[in-house]
A protein has these predicted regions:
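Twin-arginine (Tat) signal peptide motif
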Residues: 1-7
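N-terminal export signals
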Residues: 7-28
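Low-complexity, Ser/Thr/Pro/Gly-enriched N-terminal "stalk/linker" regions
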Residues: 12-13, 31-111
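Well-ordered alpha-helical scaffold segments within catalytic/enzyme domains
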Residues: 54-67, 115-128, 188-203, 282-301, ...
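Hydrophobic core segments within long, regular secondary-structure runs in both alpha-
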Residues: 72-80, 117, 121, 131-145, ...
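Aromatic-rich carbohydrate-recognition surfaces in CAZymes
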Residues: 106-242, 469-484
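Extended ligand-binding clefts on enzyme/binding-domain cores
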Residues: 110, 146-157, 171-174, 208, ...
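C-terminal capping/lid segments that line or modulate ligand- or cofactor-binding pockets
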Residues: 168-175, 179-182, 345-376, 414-492
């Protein structure tokens, strides 16, 4: 089913599902909260796709030890949701191979698949089966990148023809679900590989195929700096949705070639306005630093280190010059998009990478002026200013209503708040009151279903999109788990 049509139908249908008298809906209060009884909504054990002893252990521990029983119930449903419902694991050619769908869309996004398994990394050191599953994701992502570095989503069946083939003017190959060029699609696999290696010390996924994929990543980033030409990628779609197609013959609006990487689409899969997507370029900067750290520590890919260093330096310098702009209220802030000519947008989108999520994604190895993690750096102050702007009415996609408040975006439409943004707000906050506020918003957002949704209406949680969206579920679990370990009193 086409994603836009699916979103429209799911928002309209959600109220009908609840009105139809489901067990969960019957137990729901006016704000989406539940009474003393919490129905079983997690998929039956016999039908679960994958079981991790480490994940099950932490689920039991959290649910038993926190006072907020509704949050405990939500954690039990949400945290294992990726493993329960979206992974397809097997051994292929002697190597683990893991295909990860998003939930209700049977395709593997490079971004979502990385983000969906990321919250399990902290548990995989002592769970060999979980390690193998994540190794399988790393292997499959390398295969996908080598198939087409400009594609954002893939099928398991490499011969399957996408429904978008009939409408998309781009080089669509069999096995590709969608071919929207998004910088973050190539950053997330680096983040996952680096995180896995740091926690486990396991070198086995980083073989010749992975190195070939990393070479392709670097070459694609360099090509999309467009210093010499527009490059081989263009994209147009026959559609009534302007955000689903790219203007000017599919190459986007003009830019001044300053060293930033062009992105035709945002992580929401919506087209960019100005092709220099700043949060994605900052993510690329962190990813390049992580990649170089791995190459040097593992003594592999020595021919790639120089290219990665040159790109990192180029992107860093261009960001320092073009990413930070003066806002009339907040002072120096990060722009969301820019074009190198001085044009930029003041906004944020809920999808990650976002400006709000910069501390969540930034590499700890990066300590340059753009660091948002080190208080003595310029980037830290700029981020704090930006954060205040984003969480206010001065962000055109910050919505506030009777049911909650948070950042949305064009993808699900106006007045639709994405739980992803509330979760990221909580994960990046150092203020216990703000963390508690985010937990309460999320607790009240699930419309009695027991899971996070892609988005919900600011005035009515019963109007939501995508009832099965594994990324939001697992990320919610990560937020609860972090709070449990660092501020357990907030869960009482």
């Amino acid at each position: 089913m086409q994603r836009r049509k699916f979103l429209q139908q799911s928002v309209l249908a959600s109220a009908g599902v609840l009105a139809g008298g489901s067990v969960v809906a019957a137990a729901a209060g006016s704000a989406g909260g539940l009474g003393a009884e919490f129905p079983v909504v997690r998929i039956a054990e016999a039908k679960r796709k994958f079981k991790s002893q480490a994940v099950e252990k932490i689920v039991r521990e959290v649910r038993q030890n926190i006072g907020n029983k509704e949050i405990g119930w939500l954690f039990e449903n949400c945290f294992p949701n990726t493993l329960d419902t979206t992974v397809d694991f097997e051994l292929a050619d002697g190597k683990p191979d893991t295909y990860v769908i998003t939930g209700d869309i049977d395709a593997m996004w490079l971004r979502d698949s990385s983000a969906q398994v990321w919250p399990y990394l902290s548990l995989c050191k002592d769970d060999k089966d979980l390690q193998q599953l994540i190794r399988g994701v790393i292997h499959r992502q390398a295969k996908c990148i080598l198939k087409d570095p400009y594609a954002n989503a893939f099928y398991k069946d490499e011969s399957k023809i996408s429904e978008w083939k009939a409408t998309d003017l781009t080089d669509m190959k069999p096995g590709i679900h969608e071919r929207k060029w998004e910088i973050d699609s190539l950053c997330y696999p680096i983040r996952l590989g680096h995180g896995y290696w740091q926690i486990t010390g396991d070198k086995s996924p980083f073989d010749e195929q992975w190195l070939a994929a990393m070479k392709t990543v670097l070459e694609t980033f360099k090509t999309q700096q467009r210093k010499e030409s527009d490059g081989p990628y263009s994209f147009q779609r026959k559609t009534s949705f302007a955000t689903d197609s790219v203007p000017l013959r599919g190459y986007g609006y003009p830019t001044k070639k300053v060293g930033l990487i062009h992105s035709m689409f945002r992580p929401s899969d919506d087209a960019t306005i100005y092709p220099f997507l700043i949060p994605s370029n900052l993510f690329a900067l962190s990813s390049l630093r992580n990649l170089r750290t791995m190459l040097q520590a593992l003594s592999i890919g020595k021919d790639l280190d120089g290219l990665a260093f040159a790109l990192e330096n180029d992107v860093n310098n261009a960001l320092l010059e073009h990413a930070i702009v003066n806002h009339p209220i907040y002072g120096e802030v990060f722009a969301y998009e820019a074009d190198g000519f001085g044009n930029h947008t003041f906004m944020d989108d809920a999808n990650v990478p976002s400006l709000l999520a910069l501390p969540y994604l930034q590499s700890p190895h990066y300590s340059g002026d753009l660091s948002v993690l080190h208080p003595e750096k310029r980037g830290y102050t700029v981020y704090q200013n930006t954060r205040r702007m984003l969480l206010s009415e001065n962000n055109p996609f910050y919505f506030k209503g009777k049911a909650g408040e948070g950042i949305g975006g064009p993808h699900a439409g106006l007045n639709m708040i994405w739980p992803l943004s509330i979760i990221i707000r909580g994960l990046t906050s150092h203020d216990s009151q703000e963390v508690a506020f985010c937990l309460k918003l999320l607790q009240n957002s699930h419309a009695g279903k027991g899971f996070m949704h892609e988005s919900f209406h600011k005035d009515d949680v019963n109007k939501f999109s995508r009832p099965w969206f594994a990324w939001a579920n697992t990320l919610f679990g990560e937020f609860v788990l972090k709070t449990y370990k660092t501020q357990p009193a907030l869960l009482s």
